[in-house]
A protein has these predicted regions:
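Glycine-rich phosphate-binding active-site loops on the catalytic face of alpha/beta enzymes
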Residues: 74-89, 256-268, 308-326, 362-395
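Catalytic cores of alpha/beta
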Residues: 67-70, 244-254, 288, 294-312, ...
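Active-site-adjacent beta->alpha loops and helix N-cap segments on the catalytic face
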Residues: 85-95, 141, 156-161, 206-226, ...
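Alpha/beta catalytic cores of nucleotide-metabolism and tRNA/nucleoside-modifying enzymes
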Residues: 1-21, 109-112, 177-178, 184-188, ...
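Surface-exposed amphipathic alpha-helices with a cationic face
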Residues: 44-48, 73, 98, 121-125, ...
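Bateman/CBS regulatory modules and CBS-like beta-alpha motifs in cytosolic regions of diverse proteins
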Residues: 27-51, 58-60, 89-129, 134-137, ...
């Protein structure tokens, strides 16, 4: 006989947080939103990979490309580059994110002394970089002979065939730093000598890295930015359960910090096989999340299969119609509460803490705080990020209002059959997502800052200044339908102006 749940499943909108005691220290400026991204053992100080803010962007064509990944990493979160594209294109997006943040940056713009000004212009157009290293063999491993920047030539006054050796700044006139120079030392040299870039060279004169002034300035503007050990922006990437043997190595080679199996339903042998392949080939060196699941059994299955984090949620996304088309899913709040309990049980039994990601169901900013209070370590958002300048879709004018295009990975437009495949050879038989618009909201930075200030303020109302204490001490109440109505404006006539809901 089928199993019947005795209680209905609930959404975030059916809950509220009850205030706790607010001490003098409970102010937004004192709140830390740092949170684990991947699993760790009891006794470790923290997770091998952590987020500075509990927000990650969804594995979607209309959300997570390299531009949004850089913008989110600057704020302290991470993007998962969408996998519904060729292996080569996804790896290239990852590589662009890793090369964007310049702590110690390997040079990807190199020419030999015999190259011409036209070669410089072509390379600049291809890479977007204006600093070109001139090396003995034209590669990043060659002996550094000089540097060309846009100040060394004038297109309107020079023959495109002019050799770079005639207008480059030669090595003997360059200010360089030796191998082993720290980032602080490099930045001090840049400031003392008023440089835009500083080459780091080996004892035998080979170019190792560049350090750029612009990255120091960006760091000052973005103190929470999420960086790896080489001071590069961190980025994740989505994979599927079909071509993982080819895709995973390419993404690892490109520098992806973490992977995530992208599927509408993760309690399957296909995810187990994908996790097994990664563990057998890479051990624990490659971090990979799995999902999505909505109950204790699903979490346990993926945790035991080796997942570094588990995503929770089926059918709760704004463009997802899995519940409508297949009758599969669960209210996001109920799913999250059960999986969080399973996560804590697993930790008590094994000493291994497997973070959980709440994916879907976020409509208002306060839902973020509720999700964290209910046990989520971080939150995956699609529609939220799709509204911003940095998302990859077009901004269009619809009925006098600016909108951004937004479509689901289960839609016919995405044609991402790998995400919804059950192991057969057929393609997309029916859609589990829609093609739509979302209201344009402007730049990511100011919107994320506004949302997170609300989260921090609510945490202070609950009497806590970090996420673990919120999960431990929050008081959450289920509310009636009339309580929900009472919580909004009522019995007044609004003046005609825009509202701030997203």
């Amino acid at each position: 006989m089928a199993y019947y749940y005795s209680e209905p499943s609930h959404t975030f909108s059916e809950y509220l947080l009850v205030p706790g005691y607010t001490s003098p220290d409970c102010i937004p400026a004192n709140v830390s939103l740092r949170t684990p991204l991947v699993k760790f053992r009891k006794g470790q100080e923290e997770s091998p990979l952590s987020l500075n803010i509990p927000l990650v962007s969804a594995i979607m064509q209309s959300v997570s490309n390299d531009t949004l990944a850089v913008a989110l990493a600057k704020e302290g979160g991470i993007s998962f580059i969408y996998g519904s594209q060729s292996v080569e294109d996804e790896a290239a997006m990852v590589a662009r994110v890793k090369s964007y943040k310049a702590g110690f940056v390997p040079s990807d713009s190199n020419l030999s002394p015999d190259a011409t000004m036209q070669d410089v212009l072509d390379l600049k157009k291809r890479t977007g970089h204006s600093t070109v290293a001139i090396t003995s063999d034209g590669t990043s491993q060659g002996k550094l002979l000089g540097i060309v920047t846009s100040r060394d030539y004038r297109v309107s006054r020079m023959d495109p065939a002019t050799k770079v050796s005639t207008f480059m700044t030669p090595f003997e006139r360059l200010i360089t730093a030796p191998e082993g120079t720290t980032l602080k030392e490099a930045n001090d040299i840049i400031w003392d000598h008023k440089l835009n870039s500083l080459p780091i060279v080996s004892a035998d004169g080979r170019l190792l890295y560049f350090v750029f002034r612009k990255d120091y300035e960006q760091h000052k503007e973005n103190p929470a930015e999420l960086l790896d050990s080489q001071k590069r922006y961190m980025v994740g990437a989505g994979i599927n359960t079909k071509d993982y043997e080819k895709r995973v190595p390419a993404l690892v080679e490109a520098g992806a910090d973490v992977l995530c199996i992208d599927s509408s339903e993760g309690y399957s042998c296909w995810q187990e096989q994908t996790l097994r392949f990664i563990r057998e080939r890479y051990g624990d060196s490659v971090k990979v999340g799995a999902g999505n699941v909505v109950d204790r059994d699903g979490f346990r299955f993926l945790a035991e299969a080796g997942a570094d984090f588990v995503k929770v949620g089926i059918g709760g996304g704004s463009i997802c119609i899995t519940r409508e088309t297949k009758g599969i899913g669960r209210g996001q709040a109920t799913a999250l509460i059960e999986v969080a309990a399973a996560r804590d049980e697993y930790f008590a039994e094994t000493g291994i803490y497997v973070p959980i990601c709440s994916d879907g169901g976020i409509v208002h900013d306060y839902h973020m705080t509720l999700a964290l209070a209910m046990g989520a370590d971080f939150i995956m958002l699609g529609r939220y990020f799709a509204r911003f300048d940095e998302s990859p879709t077009n901004r269009v004018l619809v009925n006098g209002q600016y909108m951004k295009e937004y479509w689901g990975e289960g839609s016919n437009r995405a044609r991402n059959w790998q995400r919804y495949d059950l192991g057969g050879g057929t393609g997309l038989a029916f859609e589990e997502g829609v093609d739509s618009y979302v209201t344009y909201a402007g730049p990511l930075k100011e919107n994320v800052a506004k949302s997170l200030y609300k989260v921090k303020s609510t945490m202070c109302n609950c009497g806590v200044t970090n996420i673990p204490n919120l999960q431990k001490n929050a008081k959450i109440t289920l509310v009636s339908a009339t309580s929900i109505v009472e919580g909004g404006y009522h019995d007044v006539v609004l003046k005609a102006h825009g509202n701030s809901q997203h």
